[in-house]
Amino acid sequence: MEGASFGAGRAGAALDPVSFARRPQTLLRVASWVFSIAVFGPIVNEGYVNTDSGPELRCVFNGNAGACRFGVALGLGAFLACAAFLLLDVRFQQISSVRDRRRAVLLDLGFSGLWSFLWFVGFCFLTNQWQRTAPGPATTQAGDAARAAIAFSFFSILSWVALTVKALQRFRLGTDMSLFATEQLSTGASQAYPGYPVGSGVEGTETYQSPPFTETLDTSPKGYQVPAY
């Protein structure tokens, strides 16, 4: 298919790096990529603190190791997904098959919607566990990391919801058949059937018409005629 489809130009067209970097979808992916680092980075570095009763490390979120693991997994998954989808956006212009483009947009739409929901769950979960955390020297030391993870979890909800909306717009846009249809219609309308050649050597536009059928009646008497003497 030569026409544009799913918000991209014709297959094989050159990619403009400046326009690609200024696209809202690209900016949202970069923002989501940065937010994911700001979530799992502080949890990995400062999310586990020593308890007052022993040297073992516990999660800063109310000692719930599941909260720390969930935050790290969510942020790391978003980090890898943003990198993969950025690469897909770069290669999207080179995909010539409309079916493959549709699958790529559906994958983007489904993953963005799923991660928007997971970020909402993660934000609520981390906030709830942090509110239940008992104050102490350890929690005071890692408090900034916990609050940063919660804040950027909220920002990630907004960025991934925006990515979902952009993917939905691309899916609804679908295949743009207007260029292809216009070219075909204009070509068909302007092309005429050739006429028959005339004596001057120039093709005429008049159509050949057969002469009307005329029947000549024979009025002479039929049969044997007696000669006159």
Swiss-Prot record:
Record-linked Pfam families: MARVEL
Polar residues: compositionally biased ranges: 209-219
Encoding gene, per UniProt annotation: SYNGR3
Membrane topology: Multi-pass membrane protein
Keywords, comma-separated and alphabetical: Acetylation, Cytoplasmic vesicle, Membrane, Synapse, Transmembrane, Transmembrane helix
Domain of life: Eukaryota
Source organism: Homo sapiens
Protein name as catalogued: Synaptogyrin-3
MF terms (GO), sorted A to Z: SH2 domain binding
Database matches in PROSITE patterns: MARVEL
GO BP of this protein: positive regulation of transporter activity; regulated exocytosis; regulation of neurotransmitter uptake; regulation of synaptic vesicle priming; substantia nigra development
Transmembrane parts of this sequence: 30-50, 70-90, 105-125, 148-168
Bridged cysteine pairs (disulfide): none
Record's signal peptide: none
